[in-house]
Amino acid sequence: MTSFDQVTSLSAALLQCLCNAVSGHPGAPGHCAYRVGTEPVHDINLDGIDLCCEGLAYVMLGDTYPSSDSFPDNDIVRQGDNPCVPPGWAINYRVGIVRCASDPGDDTSQAAAFTQGLYDMLSLNETWCCFRDYVRSTPQFLGMSLVLERQVPGSTSGGCTERYFRMAVQIPNVDCCPN
């Protein structure tokens, strides 16, 4: 097993948790998928699909760095000659939901968007709980840590709005120390 296998397993579980969570609430996004980069692309794609207004629930892989004793902070690896340093990696994710922004001049539209935002908040909370349970029940991740950052609304731009959270997941270093 390598870090590729571990992160593939974590990512699949996280996406499944997210897709299950959003599908259980009104206004489920039309798309639930991985995204790459630093910001999810959610405007009209080349096929003319408006991912923003159809709704997009996403999981993005972020930074990866050595982190064990100071998790979730980056370790300073001073023992580079030790074959098993670092003992762990931090894997960062961003998990979110993108939607059409409501009409700022229409109170009814704003109230509906506010209610949908509450469902999105609940979906992201449920995603976190599901993923935490997955990590806790998977033997290869026993003793590893999770750090959940705050859930935040993104800026409203291009007619879209977003809610997301970031988290760091610790995995054992099986790349430098396979045994």
Residue positions per predicted region:
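Small/polar-rich, solvent-exposed N-terminal microdomains that initiate assembly or binding
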Residues: 1-82
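Extracellular/virion structural assembly segments
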Residues: 1-9, 15, 84-90, 96-132
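A broad, low-specificity signal marking well-ordered, structured residues that form hydrophobic/aromatic
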Residues: 54-58, 93, 165
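Generic structural motif
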Residues: 64, 98-102, 170-174
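A generic short-segment signal for beta-strand/edge and adjacent turn/coil regions
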Residues: 59-66, 128-140
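Short, internal active-site loops enriched in acidic
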Residues: 39-41, 100, 151-155
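Short, charged interaction patches at domain edges and termini
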Residues: 1-32, 86-90, 134-179
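Feature targets compositionally biased, intrinsically disordered low-complexity regions
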Residues: 36, 54, 61, 116, ...
